């Protein structure tokens, strides 16, 4: 059963790889941004609560995001595995997710019930990739600042997963197919 969390800095190819791996293993690629948008659009009870925060310009609280993720993972199409993209983003979110996930049943009690794919790519490559998108907000200084913020927020999260022996590091500085194959090899070792 494939249960993965994808980590990586902006431009590392998380979304691309998560989607390819999800298609290959026939499990849903679950993006927290998509979950949030669909809950708001469907006016679900969780979506209504989230919209209240969003309308005020506030961040949606971790607990609400956790509840949405938990609900999404209970969906029948996620029963045989899933790939989370963009969540958890912080140690607090990871700890809460871990607690919720572990409380869901005996199978989930072991820390190895899901793994974390961390795509590593050198900063200069990330900057070049992001600049090539030619988006208005993708200026080199802005990109480098975003990378610094990402590393500051994510390093404790990486250590959290390392301590639980859940972390799988993948060299993302390769062609898409090479990275996909490296992930598949690692996933095949753990499933």
Swiss-Prot record:
Its main location: cytoplasm. Signal peptide: none annotated. GO terms for biological process: AMP salvage. ATP binds at residues 11-16, 133, 174. The keyword Iron-sulfur does not apply. Residues 132-138 are annotated as: LID. AMP binds at residues 32, 37, 58-60, 86-89, 93, 135, 146. CDD domains: ADK. Gene3D superfamilies: P-loop containing nucleotide triphosphate hydrolases. It comes from the Bacteria. Residues 31-60 are annotated as: NMP. Pathway: Purine metabolism; AMP biosynthesis via salvage pathway; AMP from ADP: step 1/1. It is found in: Cytoplasm. Transmembrane segments: none annotated. Pfam families: ADK (PF00406). GO terms for molecular function: adenylate kinase activity; ATP binding. One of its GO terms (cellular component) is cytoplasm. InterPro entries: Adenylat/UMP-CMP_kin, Adenylat_kinase_CS, P-loop_NTPase. Its EC number is 2.7.4.3. It catalyses: AMP + ATP = 2 ADP. It is an enzyme of class 2 (transferase). Monomer. Consists of three domains, a large central CORE domain and two small peripheral domains, NMPbind and LID, which undergo movements during catalysis. The LID domain closes over the site of phosphoryl transfer upon ATP binding. Assembling and dissambling the active center during each catalytic cycle provides an effective means to prevent ATP hydrolysis. Belongs to the adenylate kinase family. Catalyzes the reversible transfer of the terminal phosphate group between ATP and AMP. Plays an important role in cellular energy homeostasis and in adenine nucleotide metabolism. This is Adenylate kinase.
């Amino acid at each position: 059963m494939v249960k993965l969390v994808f980590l990586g800095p902006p431009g590392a190819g998380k979304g691309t790889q998560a989607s390819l791996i999800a298609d290959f293993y026939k499990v849903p690629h679950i993006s927290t941004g998509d979950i949030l948008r669909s809950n708001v659009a469907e006016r679900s009870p969780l979506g209504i609560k989230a919209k209240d925060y969003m309308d005020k310009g506030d961040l949606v609280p971790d607990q609400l995001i956790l509840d949405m993720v938990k609900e999404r993972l209970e969906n029948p199409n996620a029963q045989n595995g899933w790939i989370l993209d963009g969540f958890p983003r912080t140690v607090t979110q990871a700890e809460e997710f871990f607690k919720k996930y572990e409380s869901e049943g005996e199978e989930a009690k072991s820390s190895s019930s899901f793994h974390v794919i961390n795509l590593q790519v050198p900063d200069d490559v990330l900057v070049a990739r992001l600049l090539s998108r030619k988006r208005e907000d993708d200026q080199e200084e802005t990109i480098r600042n975003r990378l610094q913020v990402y590393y500051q927020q994510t390093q404790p999260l990486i250590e959290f997963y390392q301590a639980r022996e859940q972390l799988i590091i993948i060299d993302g500085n390769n062609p898409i197919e090479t990275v996909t194959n490296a992930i598949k090899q690692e996933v095949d070792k753990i499933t």
